[in-house]
């Protein structure tokens, strides 16, 4: 689930023209979340693709979707992204015995999805052995390993460390 050079080129164009946040969706699969730098040094947060929020496609990759969580803060020095994350969702569909169609279609947070639900999923019932909870969790881990999700927390931590150090130094100077 990697973004293409064309997606990267378009994201860079938008960043260079002042866009702060890009949320993509087309390729039906979740792609990495990255920070990119504009020509002027500003940074843009890019969710290359959130995939499908709901779908009855027939691959594991198409059943896993993403949910962007972004906090935008307005302060005296301007507006900025103060927090962001990526949560995963699973499209679940199944068929009642009395129906010839998939008539139960819903979306679950991956964190709440169970092996029992996966066993009842239309893909599992139709014989797709690749569809199971472990494959969904593995795919989400693979995607997360390519994301820049810890960067804002690392920046916040380094700010805290600087604050703590400067506080310690000023306290030492006062004694």
Where are these regions (language model features)?
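Short acidic, glycine-rich surface-loop motifs adjacent to enzyme active sites
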Residues: 1-2
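Conserved beta-sheet core of the metallophosphoesterase superfamily
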Residues: 5-66
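A short C-terminal boundary segment appended to hydrolase-like catalytic domains
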Residues: 60-175
């Amino acid at each position: 689930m990697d973004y293409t050079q064309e997606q990267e080129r378009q994201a860079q164009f938008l960043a260079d023209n002042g866009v702060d946040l890009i949320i993509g969706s087309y390729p039906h699969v979740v792609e990495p979340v990255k920070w990119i730098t504009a020509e002027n040094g500003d940074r843009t947060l890019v969710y290359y693709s959130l995939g499908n929020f709901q779908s009855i496609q027939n691959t594991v990759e198409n059943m896993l979707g993403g949910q962007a969580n972004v906090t935008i803060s307005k302060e005296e020095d301007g507006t900025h992204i103060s927090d962001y994350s990526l949560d995963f969702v699973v499209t679940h569909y199944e068929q009642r015995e009395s129906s010839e169609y998939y008539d139960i279609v819903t979306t679950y947070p991956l964190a709440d999805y169970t092996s029992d639900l996966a066993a009842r999923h239309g893909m599992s019932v139709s014989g797709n052995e690749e569809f199971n909870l472990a494959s969904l969790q593995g795919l989400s881990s693979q995607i997360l390993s390519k994301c820049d999700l810890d960067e804002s927390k690392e920046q916040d931590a380094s700010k805290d460390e600087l604050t703590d150090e400067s506080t310690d130094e000023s306290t030492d100077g006062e004694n």
